[in-house]
Amino acid sequence: MSQLIATKRVDLLAPYLALDQGSRVQAEYIWIDAEGGIRSKTMTLDKAPSSVADLKEWNFDGSSTNQAPADNSDVFLRPVAIFKDPFRGGANILVLCECYDNDGTPNKSNYRAHCKKVMDAAKDTEPWFGLEQEYTLFDADGQVFGWPKNGFPGPQGPYYCGVGAGKVFARDFIEAHYRACLYAGIKISGINAEVMPSQWEFQVGPCTGIEMGDHLWMARFLLLRIGEEWGITPSLHPKPLKGDWNGAGCHSNYSTKDMRTPGKGMAAIEDAIKKLEKKHLEHIAVYGEDNDLRLTGKHETASMTTFSAGVANRGASIRIPRHVGAQGYGYLEDRRPASNVDPYRVTAILVETTVLNN
């Protein structure tokens, strides 16, 4: 990978990362901007916090992130979750934040605030989630990583969960991300190479309620930061390449306590599916940008305009896994969300539709 343009010289940085920083801690404050991108900046703390409550509220220039006008540009960062920092190590931390305007209301980009209200209202039903984040890797030239220059690899077929040179690309990058997530405390549950070469997937969950969005956003942050070091750009576009190539989704596995209960689980799952069918277009509206390029009824997707459900059917809007159908309880998989979906929005609307009946 020496031909890539990396932004970090490990050999130069390592001696400085090894320096003693005493009791002081670097806290990387992380937030989501107006376009669904990720931003961050660093604060020095006198000592390691014992909880989120020990962290200071901070602010940033919202006019530079399209989150506020220039004449009233301060946007406030309220810490909501702490993770270990795999880049700096030691007691240094990553701090996920919500964005608030100066009048105390959630910023227009803050979908977490609404999601938290939804999850609090539905907490007795114990909503669990597991999200499957697909993404595509691009090199410094804007080419799909590992693909022939000015050409294409062989047709799809040997790449899904593939092993061997020419079938799998950037496995070292993928492994680095996996380990970084584990170190940080993110509930990453697995990885696999996807159908299109240089397309990968990681899974996060099971997570309860608001925790799902927090952990997926932090996993995305680590993916982008590690990409800086490799000179690789991970893309969450749901259809990064035209033609006979699979798109990228964020399949959303979801259950409530009733769905997981033997004897009545399948009835609860079927009831949820009926509710989801009635709200199909409302869900599509918040399931990610450019999803129409992906949900074509081809390449293991359902039609964007038609709702469908079935056991073990990867061409359906909602899939009931085979083992769930056999045992009669478990969870459902919503296959409609695009890879760039905001996890707070998808988890919130699933609960609103199936539990709160909104």
Swiss-Prot record:
Chief place where the protein resides: cytoplasm
Tagged with keyword Signal: no
InterPro entries: Gln_synt_N (IPR008147), Gln_synt_N_sf (IPR036651), Gln_synth/guanido_kin_cat_dom (IPR014746), Gln_synth_cat_dom (IPR008146), Gln_synth_gly_rich_site (IPR027303), Gln_synth_N_conserv_site (IPR027302), Glutamine_Synthetase (IPR050292)
Molecular functions per Gene Ontology: ATP binding; glutamine synthetase activity
Superkingdom of source: Eukaryota
Catalytic reaction list: L-glutamate + NH4(+) + ATP = L-glutamine + ADP + phosphate + H(+)
One GO cellular component, as annotated: cytoplasm
PANTHER family in the cross-refs: GLUTAMINE SYNTHETASE, GLUTAMINE SYNTHETASE 2 CYTOPLASMIC
Protein name (database record): Glutamine synthetase
Organism: Cryptococcus neoformans var. neoformans serotype D (strain JEC21 / ATCC MYA-565) (Filobasidiella neoformans)
